Every structure is written in structure tokens, then in C-alpha cells.
Amino acid sequence: SSGFWLVSLLCVLCYSAIFPFQKYAVNMLQCNLTFTEVPADSFWGSQSVTYIQYVIMLFVAATAFLFNFMKQKAVKFFVLALSIAGLVTYCYMGYMRQSAESIFAVFPLLAVGITPVLGNYVDHKGKAASMLVLGSILLIACHLTFAFVLPEFKGNQVGGVIVAYLTILVLGASFSLVPASLWPSVPKLVDAKVIGSAYALIFWIQNIGLWLFPLLIGKVLNATNEGVTDATQLNYTAPLVMLACLGVAALFIGFVLKIVDKKKNLGLELPNIQE
């Protein structure tokens, strides 16, 4: 059906704007943020702080996930407060380490917390197609922020890191909108007898994008940085705009999907749990 092919295109566009970007994200941060060298013999330059950050990441992920399943309000919000405190602590440690790797590692933490919320919302309230549109809008906003806003903070250590953290967290949230809303939509678009083949076809199409766009990012990066030999001085504006264009294409297809859903009564905006 046309709905299935639209969902497949949305999948490849959204994932191609995120997964290939992850391969270049650390270097992009190195090019757009100002870091100072941390003494190797200090606490922030030691290997111990890396292990502590790993533990904090697991703590944040666990508490954010558990928050969704707590019944008592007091306990629920206490767990949420612990998760937020852990996230802030992790971000502070990433800043003190002056490490682009530590900063980008925050990417999945918000997604861990909100994906169950989004999945539960789709089950009980629906609006899967609208979530895909929202995810595309967030995707566009994040890549344009990386392209045009973040470079303006170069030289401002605190401001640049704050913008980077917020944008990375929102990008993670946009990423979580895709699996929470897209994958549950597939059974509504194909016959149950071929659901396995449908998922396989989507993954096949998706992998074409995951193969192609890392190459394109590298080609565009080389073409727009001729003569630049310092890897921390590259200009990422053009590749980021290209990724934002994927978000624009996904947004357009998302609106088309909503129109097709309304005309053909595909049920994408309806809850999965029908009373």
C-alpha cells in the first residue's frame, strides 16, 4: 500500500539523518566548541572519572526507565528527581573533562526515559503519524542549531556546552519518536501473513540510506573544506544542512502520510488499544 511505502521512506530519512551523523558528531563538536587541555595527572584527566560517568549513565537510564512504571506518585517523582540529578551530574562531569566524546555520550539518555512514555501514548491515544511529523520538526531544528547556532558560541566554553547538551538531548528525543510511533504502525499497513517480509523490506531500504549518507557527508565535508589540514577546524555547515534537508523531506512525507491515512482510514492516528 502507499502508506507502507511512505512509512518506509520516513524510516530511511529519519535514521539516515541520525545514525550517519553519529559517526561525525564528536569531530563536529571539536570543531565548534572551545576546549582547554585537562592535566593528565588531575582527577578530571584520569581514567577513574570515565568509569564514574559510565555508572552515572546506567543510573540515569535505569531511573528514567523505571519512572514510567511507578504507581505511587511520591515514589514516581522521587525517582524522576534522582534521574534528573544524575543527568545534570553527568553533564557537569562531561564539561569538566573538556571532552567532546563525553558531551555527545548524553545522546541516548533522554530517549531512554521518554520512549516508554511515547509508546504508551501511541497505545492508548494514537497519533502515530503526528509523532512522526513532530520527530521530523525536532530533527530539522537540531541540525540547523548545530549548523548555525553552535558555531556562534565558539570561544564561550559554558554557553557552547549548554547549547550542545540541549541540542543533543532533543535530537535523542526526536530519534525516540521514530521507533515509538513508526514500528507499531506497520501491522496496520500490511497483511499479518507478510509482516515479517514487510519489516525485512523496511530494514533493507533503511540500510541503503545508512550505507549512502556517511559517504555523502564525507564527500560534502571534503568538498567544502579544501586545504584544511587541521581536523578540529572543519566547517560542518554544509553536511548539517544536508541532514536538515532529510528532515524537511521526512516532514513533507509525514504530512502526505497523514493525508493518506485520513483518505484511506489506515488507522495510524488511532490508538492501538481499542475498547
Predicted segments with their positions:
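A membrane-interface helix-boundary motif in multi-pass transporters
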Residues: 219-247
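Transmembrane alpha-helical cores of Major Facilitator Superfamily
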Residues: 12, 105-109, 137, 200-208
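Helix-to-loop junctions at the C-terminal end of transmembrane segments
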Residues: 63-71, 114-127, 221
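Multi-pass alpha-helical transporter architecture, strongest
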Residues: 147-150, 236-275
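C-terminal transmembrane helical hairpin of 12-TM major facilitator-type secondary transporters
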Residues: 78-94, 99, 105-110, 128-182
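A late C-terminal transmembrane helix in Major Facilitator Superfamily
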Residues: 192-226
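Extracytoplasmic gate region of multi-pass secondary transporters
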Residues: 1-60, 86-111, 115, 179, ...
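Intracellular helix-loop hinge segments at the cytoplasmic ends of transmembrane helices
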Residues: 27, 183-189
